[in-house]
């Protein structure tokens, strides 16, 4: 198993958040367009929250601390 580098792990989430933010909207109409946009908004929020987390190891568990302030 590869060794986990937490800083690189979090950086990948920041990169994913930026990619979601920059990608264009495909040619969709109606409900499909609305669903796609909502999904992209959720993806961005999820990736950006994890990407800005502070981390620690506590009793063999990775602990991510995510501030809810912007």
Go through the PLM ranges and name each one.
Residues 1-70:
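Compositionally biased, non-globular sequence tracts
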């Amino acid at each position: 198993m590869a060794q986990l580098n937490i800083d690189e792990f979090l950086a990948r989430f920041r990169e994913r958040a930026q990619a979601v933010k920059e990608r264009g909207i495909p040619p969709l109409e109606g409900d499909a367009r609305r669903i796609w946009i909502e999904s992209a908004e959720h993806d961005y929020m999820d990736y950006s929250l994890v990407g800005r987390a502070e981390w620690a190891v506590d009793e063999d568990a990775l602990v991510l601390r995510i501030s809810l302030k912007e």
